[in-house]
């Protein structure tokens, strides 16, 4: 059974339209978040962890996109932070980076970005 995915129309003209799914937006958010120094990785739920161990790693693990209204989304991230980094500062950088990536690449307006810190990663573990 195929997953029920939300899609967004990002361009429509006489030649046709361009639609993207919420999965694409989640991947963009996840990649942007992991580019921030101090973010060790994304943290997924149990289902994501099982999928990852089965060899079907998803780039959107730990990311949820919520449609607020047409072309407006909220982002929920679950991340692991590296030990020794200032968590509020890292989270502010993640919020800025994710918002800019989604708005510039896709054209959707990001209304909020909520971050849950799942764990602190210690070097060597």
Predicted regions and their residues:
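A generic structural motif
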Residues: 81-87
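Short, non-transmembrane amphipathic alpha-helical segments
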Residues: 87-106, 110
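Contiguous, often N-terminal, cationic amphipathic patches that form binding interfaces
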Residues: 2-81, 110-114, 118, 123-125
């Amino acid at each position: 059974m195929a997953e029920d995915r939300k899609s967004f129309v990002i361009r429509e003209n006489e030649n046709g339209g361009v639609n993207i799914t919420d999965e694409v937006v989640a991947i963009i958010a996840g990649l942007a978040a992991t580019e921030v120094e101090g973010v060790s990785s994304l943290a997924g739920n149990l289902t994501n962890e099982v999928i990852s161990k089965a060899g079907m790693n998803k780039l959107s693990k730990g990311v949820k996109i919520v449609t607020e209204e047409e072309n407006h989304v909220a982002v929920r991230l679950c991340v692991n932070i590296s030990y020794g980094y200032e968590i509020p500062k890292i989270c502010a950088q993640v919020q800025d980076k994710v918002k800019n990536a989604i708005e510039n690449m896709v054209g959707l307006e990001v209304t909020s970005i909520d971050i849950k810190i799942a764990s602190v990663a210690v070097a060597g573990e």
